[in-house]
Every structure is written in C-alpha cells, then in structure tokens.
Regions:
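N-terminal, active-site-proximal structural segment of metallo-dependent hydrolase catalytic domains
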Residues: 1-38, 43-60, 134-141, 155, ...
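Residue-level detector of short, conserved catalytic/binding motifs and their immediate flanks
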Residues: 15, 60-63, 101, 113
Length: 166
C-alpha cells in the first residue's frame, strides 16, 4: 500500500498534497518516502505516532505535505461560536469529527496561498450507541434508519457551515 501511494504521489509530483483518511502520520511519511520526492513539511494533527501518541483515535484525520514554505498552520477542533447545532438523540454538536486544517504557504515567486484540507462526515447513517460502541437502536427499523440519516445530514451540514468562516 505504501508503495502504491508513493507511486501516486510521484505521478502527481505536486508542491502541495492535501490528504484525508490518515490514521498514522508515520504511514503517510513512509508513502512520501517511497515516492522518491522531497517534502520538507508533513503534518497530520491528531494522527501523530511517536512515543506519546499512537496515531488517530476513533476517526482518521486530514493532513498536508508540501515543498513550499509554511507560514502558518492551524487545526480547528471546535466550531466557531454561533455554529453549534442540536442533533436529535445526540444533543449539541459543537466539534468537527475530523478537524479541518488551514495552512498559509508561500509560493516560489512570493505569492501567499491558503490551503484548506477538510473531510466532512460521510452520508452513512449516524446510529446511537453506548460508551462501548454497541448499538442502542434497532437498525432494522425504518423510522430509526430515517432518524439516523437525518442525524448524519445535520452533522455534515453543521460541519460545512463554519468551513466558510475559517
């Protein structure tokens, strides 16, 4: 898999790679290494894998790899004030499931470039579950399925709203 990804990265030969579905920054760095290309900056906030972190927990993260100079980078876990939304059965939705990443880069001829890397919640229904991850709803019930689909739609829309204001 790392070799396959490395081949894709080499074919792109991009100055900036915005990535999603990263569970482990070491794996991304490994794929970049297999590309044979040099990326001076690689970051996947929340998916660090080192002595104190064990990669992403619960959901994959987004990241960036670039050859350009990085002037600023920020990951946003919380929605900005005023963007919280009530989700039926879950309560107030106040956080991004996969925090978006905003990076300000300096291009080779001096222009400033802002890159937003985001991965919104899937359209897959959001069923209620207990603290251990066990379902607390009958997934075969059409009403439950409809409500779970509504939850997903609300959460996806709630995450899309503040992206316009970051």
């Amino acid at each position: 898999k790392l070799t396959w990804l490395g081949d894709r990265f080499r074919m792109l030969n991009a100055d900036v790679l915005a990535v999603q579905e990263v569970w482990d920054d070491a794996a991304l760095k490994g794929a970049l290494g297999r590309s044979g290309l040099r990326y001076d900056f690689v970051a996947v906030p929340g998916a660090e894998n080192d002595a104190t972190h064990g990669g992403a927990q619960g959901t994959p993260q987004v990241g960036i790899a670039t050859r350009l100079k990085v002037e600023a980078m920020q990951s946003f876990a919380e929605f900005p004030p005023g963007f919280q939304v009530d989700v039926p059965g879950l309560g107030l939705h106040t956080r991004f499931e996969r925090p978006p990443l905003v990076a300000t880069l300096r291009m080779k001829h001096g222009q400033s470039l802002t890159v937003l890397t985001a991965h919104l919640k899937s359209k897959r229904p959001k069923f209620l579950q207990d603290a251990q991850g066990n379902p607390t709803e009958d997934r075969d019930d059409r009403k439950v399925m409809a409500l779970a689909s509504l939850r997903s739609l609300i959460m996806r829309g709630a995450a899309a709203m503040p992206l316009r204001c970051l």
